[in-house]
């Protein structure tokens, strides 16, 4: 799994789902919608698709309550991770202010609980041996996402609170992406 850390940033939508959502986004844009709201942003798949269909990043609001997404969202929007108050065994608080290291720590520590399985143990060993390489790849992926989405807004915010804020905006297209679909990442929440 971690042999391709870039997979974190590709989203979980299959091509047919991406095409459908792109069609919806394109139609919304030409019909007067000027704001995309992505609660439960995950890996920001909807935000990426919105940019691909002509929305400016400044027209995108995203939110989530997961640590993975919040680290990414803060990195993309240039916010300090200090507000997240990250603490993790084996990492200094100062290290965890670096988004790539914070994502590495999140993944590494979430895999430890499955280390008795050979598959996960092998990945943990790889992560330890090639720590700097994994962090560098994560940084490249964060830089790529930032180059595409910089200008959007992100908050660590509950979906219901975000929906309440935008429910009466007639120009906002709300596309929540909760982790309840077949390819979802419910396991991200088991840490």
What spans do the regions from the language model cover?
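Class I S-adenosyl-L-methionine-dependent methyltransferase catalytic core
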Residues: 1-191
């Amino acid at each position: 799994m971690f042999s391709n850390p870039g997979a974190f940033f590709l989203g979980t939508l299959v091509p047919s789902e991406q095409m459908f959502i792109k069609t919806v986004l394109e139609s919304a844009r030409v019909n007067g919608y000027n704001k995309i709201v992505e609660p439960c942003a995950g890996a920001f798949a909807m935000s990426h698709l919105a940019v691909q269909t002509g929305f400016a990043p400044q027209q995108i609001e995203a939110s989530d309550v997961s640590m993975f997404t919040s680290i990414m969202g803060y990195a993309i929007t240039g916010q300090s991770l200090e507000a997240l108050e990250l603490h993790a065994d084996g990492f200094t608080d100062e290290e965890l202010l670096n988004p790539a290291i914070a994502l590495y720590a999140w993944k590494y520590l979430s895999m430890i609980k499955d280390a008795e399985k050979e598959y996960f143990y092998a990945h943990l060993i790889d992560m330890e041996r090639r720590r700097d390489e994994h962090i560098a790849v994560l940084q490249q992926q964060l830089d790529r996402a930032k180059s595409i989405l910089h200008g959007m807004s992100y908050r660590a915010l509950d979906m219901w609170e975000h929906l309440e804020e935008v429910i009466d905006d007639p120009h906002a297209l709300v596309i929540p992406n909760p982790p309840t679909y077949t390819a979802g990442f419910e396991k991200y929440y088991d840490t």
